[in-house]
Amino acid sequence: MGVRPCFRSVGPSERGALIRAVLFDLDDTLFDHRHASRQALEAVRDCHATVALVDASDLDRRHSEILEALHLRVLAKEMTLDDARQERFRRLFEGLGVSAADLEDGLLARRAAWAYRTRYIQSWREVRGATALLRALKPHVRIGVVSNNLAREQHDKLRFCGFDRHLDAVVISEEAGAAKPDPAIFRQALERLPAEAAETVMIGDAWATDIAGARAAGMRAIWFNPCGTSRPEAWHDVEEIRALEPVPAVMSVVFGNDNRRE
């Protein structure tokens, strides 16, 4: 059984607008990064006995926090990608109590980074329902992706999942020179579609970057919240979905009273 769909609409006045374009976040909205990362961490367990004993959810939480912090430094060009990958596992292992002697020469961190990356790529998949939703939207709207990441990585994911054939615009922070939540990256996406902010919906899982950024750019936003995370206090009128299927239900949230969803 998958995630039980939950569609929350609060703020019907916004749904009356004619929608001509839909923007998506990529990681953990269309592309299932969470699944690939968790599978990859299982490969990392084999690198050291201490790591093998750690609870999977705790390992995932610790890794995600370090990944996010270093990811921002990579995007800011403060670290190379290879250095960040090695540093990520050095910090992770250090936090789990792996001895300084085991970490001293960097070999353990490099081995873990290689194991993670190899399994991560092997575990790539779409979020369930992503392709079906893109296909259903395509006859009615222009579709784009706005993502904070390195360009090559994201283009590879788009091609692997086949999303690229459904898209009218792809804007990635490394190429754009701006990152979500900066309205500038959303404006670039609107120019490439092309579309106006008032006729565009942004769908993403990250409140601080996807939702806040889209709203700052003048767009309506739909929060993709598959884990059922508690809603932040701000903007109670933001609509919420917890799955990308069934497609007709998602289309209903996107289009509101517009009969194109039929």
Predicted segments with their positions:
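Asp-based, Mg2+/Mn2+-dependent phosphohydrolase catalytic module
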Residues: 2-22, 34-35, 131, 135, ...
